[in-house]
Amino acid sequence: SLDIKGSEYYTIYIRDIQTKKNITKEITETSGSITFSLDDKYIFYTKLDENHRGRKIYRHEIGNFTNEDELIFEEKSEAFTVSIGLSSDEKYYFINTSDHNTSEQYYFNVDEHKPKPKLIKERQRGILYSVNSWNGKFYNHTNENAEDFKIDIADNLEKPDWKTFIAAKEEVLIGGLTFLKNWIIRGETS
């Protein structure tokens, strides 16, 4: 993606690296962030509104016309902005929507041919959360009942039974997790 005007409205170009020719017509007015499908047939991208907020998530089939792009998710609140990313274990896409102090997240399986994002937990004013998956478990980095955050763990997202994985600590900001093959790295600031 490229922002040639300095406006932070990015244009996405998909180019064949061998022929150096664009495969797809340019996709304009995006956040610039691109998430590829695991089979490299699709990209997911965020369209920006006139207030420069991510509002809609689209799926584009590489090589097809952009007017055929499929709307996957639309954020209705003008106060919130939306983005999409792949889970650490590459089994789910997570759609994140948030303002400065409230968030909400949706997910769908990478194998879904017609993605239908499912809500993880409804937004509650002042509650931030971010779920990721790794090794058959789901990890929730949240400030719910934890001013400086904590990390909970669950076996599924259909009916999650969240258990404490890393408890909140007084005057210690619990950062997120990074997942490696044999390690989980966490960040803390005191």
How does the language model describe each region?
Residues 1-190:
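Peripheral, non-catalytic segments that deliver or gate enzyme domains
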